[in-house]
Regions:
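Helix-loop-helix junctions within the multi-pass membrane cores of secondary transporters/permeases
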Residues: 12, 76, 103-121, 125-129, ...
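Membrane-helix interface "capping/anchor" motifs
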Residues: 66-77, 220-226, 352-357, 400-408
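Core transmembrane helix bundle of multi-pass membrane transport proteins
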Residues: 2-29, 90-312, 377-432
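Alpha-helical transmembrane segments of multipass membrane proteins
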Residues: 38-41, 61-69, 88, 114-115, ...
């Protein structure tokens, strides 16, 4: 039974009754996407058994669906967290030991996520400059591609050990964090020709064909093939080739999971919190990474999916963050990689016709069913096929289109973007984002922003008449003082004619302009009007409507 296309779908059990077939179908299609991706993400994250990536997606679907503040997002493990989780596992020694200790970081970070939501910190994503965030995501994409290339080539795991571990600290028996800057990306790149020379011919063929399929499908814009998830075709072709080449005789070539019931009955709780006392500095560092980057990526997805929602429903970001934190606490205790609201599966969910949160629930149920009855099929999937899917995910984060977009915004944003990428890859994500933030502050000051305006919004609301409001901003409108301006705007009475007057601002940066246009869309969707005014002498630093603008008088 389906609803009228103009009627907003109901939530809860009523929503399931109204949209059962649509959500069931979408949930099944997303399941076909999620299964191979969840396996690949878990493996790439350093989790010994990839089944735990699927367990994360199951919890995200079956449990978090009903805790979530968003209706159409799909919760599950994310490629964007691969460098962080794999880095965390390696920092604690790698293998089983590193996994158990990394789970301690995941659980503590998850509790922090819950607190973020309860303290209504869902808006903190607005504080970060857009160029720095996009730089971080592009850097993550590049890291994913680099780390998956050896697997695509079928390189045996023992040739990768030196590229993934640092010098062991005799005091702890763990890799010295000082030797592991940038998750060893620089060292991995230097050693790549030597590493790839150990390729396996049959696995390389499977990997390359898988890569051609997943990239080729991205160019299909319509027709029957567009409706088929590319990962499904990749897995079918890869399994067929794997059987033909008899790669089951090649060590480490195929996914190995074991039976779900056997794994969970043997050891249901896998977390180890001893890292808190043995190496507290390393523990705290990775907790911060997981909590901040995971929360940020999830919040950005929620915002993006709200824009794609056919009914323009608004999510509760704080509730969603709390739900994700609760889900991650459970997955961390059991052994899974952390989940976020994942953008690729969520946008596909909308494309497949999902109407309510039940699509996420059904996708989780199908995943659970697969682990109960389809393990023999899962265990003939070649790892190079999963590597191809992850390389494509990395490419989406760091595509040439992203670089062109940042250049279109202006040289200031492009510089911040590039510097953030370099520092994230050479050092770590937190240092990279912090560098991007500081660089944007410096560029804003160089453009004429006053230091006293960096963190203080100077905005007043004037009521012209009963139906007309003016928000007059003086000083500078910057990412670093935007939350104060946003607070005044969201508190305005709905349904009025609002003018955001930026004519007296010396500097209006890109992040603020972009956020104001989003607020404008939200306000007008609720029946009001909003106009954003800037001075005729404001000069844009780029070619976009939201490029940074600087007031040039005389």
């Amino acid at each position: 039974m389906s609803t009228n296309s103009n009627q907003i779908p109901k939530d809860g059990l009523e929503g399931m009754k109204q949209n059962f077939l649509a959500d069931l179908q979408s949930g099944f299609m997303v399941f076909l996407l999620a299964l191979p991706l969840s396996l690949g993400i878990a493996k790439a994250s350093g989790i010994p058994n990839p089944i735990f990536g699927v367990i994360t997606a199951i919890i995200g679907g079956i449990i978090v669906s009903f805790l979530s503040g968003s209706r159409l997002t799909i919760k599950g493990p994310a490629a964007g967290l691969i460098p962080i989780i794999s880095g965390c596992v390696v920092a604690f020694g790698g293998g089983e030991q590193g996994w158990h200790l990394a789970l301690g970081c995941i659980v503590v970070a998850s509790v922090i996520q819950v607190l973020f939501g309860l303290l209504k910190m869902g808006n903190f994503a607005d504080f970060f400059p857009g160029a720095a965030i996009h730089g971080m995501l592009a850097s993550i994409g590049i890291m994913i591609i680099i780390k998956q290339l050896p697997i695509l080539f079928g390189v045996a795991g023992n040739f990768l050990k030196d590229a993934h571990t640092g010098v062991v600290d005799p005091a702890t028996g763990l890799p010295d964090p000082k030797t592991m800057k940038g998750y060893d990306i620089v060292g991995l790149v230097k050693n790549m020709p030597s590493i790839l020379s150990h390729y396996d011919q049959h696995l390389l063929i499977i990997g390359v064909i898988s890569l051609v399929i997943v990239f080729g499908f991205s160019f299909i814009k319509s027709g029957f093939l567009k409706k088929i998830p590319a990962p499904l075709i990749v897995i079918i072709v890869a399994i067929t080739l794997g059987i033909s080449f008899m790669v089951k005789d090649t060590p480490g070539a195929l996914v190995k999971t074991g039976r779900l019931t056997d794994i969970l009955s043997t050891q249901f709780i896998n977390v180890d919190f001893s890292g808190i006392s043995s190496i507290p500095g390393v523990f705290i560092k990775w907790v911060i990474f997981i909590a901040l980057v995971g929360s940020l990526e999830s919040l950005l997805t929620v915002k993006a999916i709200d824009g794609l929602d056919p009914w323009k429903r608004k999510s509760n970001a704080n509730k969603d963050l709390t739900g994700v934190g609760i889900g991650n606490t459970l997955t961390g205790l059991i052994g899974g990689s952390p989940m976020i609201a994942e953008v690729v599966r969520s946008s596909a969910n909308i494309g497949f016709g999902a109407k309510t949160r039940w699509a996420n629930f059904f996708h989780g149920m199908f995943l659970l069913l697969a682990l109960l009855v389809a393990v023999p099929i899962i265990e003939v999937i070649p790892y190079p096929a999963l590597a191809a899917l992850l390389i494509f995910a990395g490419y989406r984060l760091a595509s040439p289109k992203e670089f062109r977009h940042m250049l279109h915004l202006g040289m200031d944003q492009f510089i911040i973007f590039i510097v953030t990428i370099i520092v994230c890859a050479a050092d770590d994500l937190l240092v990279g984002v912090a560098t991007g933030i500081v660089l944007e502050l410096i560029l804003n000051i160089v453009s004429g922003a006053k230091i006293g305006n960096l963190f203080k919004s100077r905005a007043v609301v004037e009521e012209k008449n009963s139906n007309q409001l003016v928000v007059r901003v003086t000083g500078d409108a910057l990412f670093s003082n935007y939350l104060g301006l946003k607070k005044k705007i969201v508190e305005l009475q709905k349904g009025k004619n609002v003018t955001i007057d930026l004519a007296q601002c010396k500097v209006i940066d890109h992040t603020t302009l972009n956020s104001l246009h989003e607020l404008q869309h939200d306000y007008e969707s609720e029946g009001g009007t909003m106009i954003i005014l800037n001075h005729e002498h404001h000069v844009a630093k780029g070619k976009s409507e939201t490029s940074t603008k600087v007031l040039k008088l005389g």
